[in-house]
Amino acid sequence: MHNESPIKRRKSTRIYVGNVPIGDGAPIAVQSMTNTRTTDVEATVRQIQSLERVGVDIVRVSVPTMDAAEAFKLIKQRVNVPLVADIHFDYRIAMKVAEYGVDCLRINPGNIGSEERIRQVVDSARHHNIPIRIGVNGGSLEKDIQEKYGEPTPEALVESAMRHVDILDRLNFDQFKVSVKASDVFLAVGSYRLLAQKIDQPLHLGITEAGGARSGSVKSAIGLGMLLAEGIGDTLRISLAADPVEEVKVGFDILKSLRIRSRGINFIACPTCSRQEFDVIGTVNALEQRLEDIITPMDVSIIGCVVNGPGEAEVSTLGVAGAKTKSGFYEDGVRKKERFDNDNIIDQLEAKIRAKAAMLDEITV
């Protein structure tokens, strides 16, 4: 029930990663990356399928060897989501996975090699109608750029990116997106801002090596939030030293918070105090776990007392405002006669949410 996002997105060109449109106003795609051994086909397929279940749009898979390329071929046949092959050092691996149906090639300008090698990769990508991501990383810049700037700077990252953008331009290849990632928030943000002024291609956002689940989520939310609020970004990945499933959840939460893209329930819940009339924290935790399968966008407010409860409920799809023994229930901003028993509030609210989701899904069909 909240208003649409006020963010005006940067105009960019359109490419496709598999069947997923990127850029030119398409929904910002949420990406993750497997952390299994790619040669372990079963483990990698299982992880990709777990990412599919939480709504991932694109999955990147590291392909460090020719053996991994052979495994990638088998993996691609068993999953539905578009796959990006992450290529470093050996350009021949990129050409091999292109034959095997990869949906996008990620190459690192800092280690992929000479312009002639890039030309061969581009020729292969063109032949197989595959886009490329130029993936610059502050930790692996070309040696001459490192020597020129002394340390990673926005100008250094963007110079690395533009060097390879120019190569693709000379080769008349425009099916690409670019990333300029860094582990430092301000370095990454500055790099993306500078790059956004120079090219029209889609930008893939990320704070690389952000950290564990908590610290990495915070870093990513700050850095990507700054850029997204300025309209910069067409795809994103939250890089966490954690289960990749968490990357997808955090990515969607960031987009929901900025009202850029909604998937599933946006829970609005108070931090609780002595005024709470039911167990708010337990209720929210239980519902988040129970309702992970709901992809229908909706706002659900769960407030433990009548101070802010009614006000939040009035601007939510569904809402509960705590009261003695039985709490008030709101739907589409209107208070209902029905009240929830505080001792059974989780089950009652789950039933209401599922029913509302089903109704909204019917309306949008």
Swiss-Prot record:
Its cofactor is [4Fe-4S] cluster. Its EC number is 1.17.7.3. It catalyses: (2E)-4-hydroxy-3-methylbut-2-enyl diphosphate + 2 oxidized [2Fe-2S]-[ferredoxin] + H2O = 2-C-methyl-D-erythritol 2,4-cyclic diphosphate + 2 reduced [2Fe-2S]-[ferredoxin] + H(+); (2E)-4-hydroxy-3-methylbut-2-enyl diphosphate + oxidized [flavodoxin] + H2O + 2 H(+) = 2-C-methyl-D-erythritol 2,4-cyclic diphosphate + reduced [flavodoxin]. [4Fe-4S] cluster binds at residues 270, 273, 305, 312. GO terms for biological process: isopentenyl diphosphate biosynthetic process, methylerythritol 4-phosphate pathway; terpenoid biosynthetic process. Pathway: Isoprenoid biosynthesis; isopentenyl diphosphate biosynthesis via DXP pathway; isopentenyl diphosphate from 1-deoxy-D-xylulose 5-phosphate: step 5/6. Keywords: 4Fe-4S, Iron, Iron-sulfur, Isoprene biosynthesis, Metal-binding, Oxidoreductase. It is an enzyme of class 1 (oxidoreductase). One of its GO terms (molecular function) is 4 iron, 4 sulfur cluster binding. It comes from the Bacteria. Gene3D superfamilies: Dihydropteroate synthase-like, Sulfite Reductase Hemoprotein, domain 1. Binds 1 [4Fe-4S] cluster. HAMAP family: IspG. Converts 2C-methyl-D-erythritol 2,4-cyclodiphosphate (ME-2,4cPP) into 1-hydroxy-2-methyl-2-(E)-butenyl 4-diphosphate. Involved in density-dependent regulation of 2'-N-acetyltransferase. Belongs to the IspG family. PANTHER family: 4-HYDROXY-3-METHYLBUT-2-EN-1-YL DIPHOSPHATE SYNTHASE (PTHR30454), 4-HYDROXY-3-METHYLBUT-2-EN-1-YL DIPHOSPHATE SYNTHASE (FERREDOXIN), CHLOROPLASTIC (PTHR30454:SF0). This is 4-hydroxy-3-methylbut-2-en-1-yl diphosphate synthase (flavodoxin). It comes from Providencia stuartii.
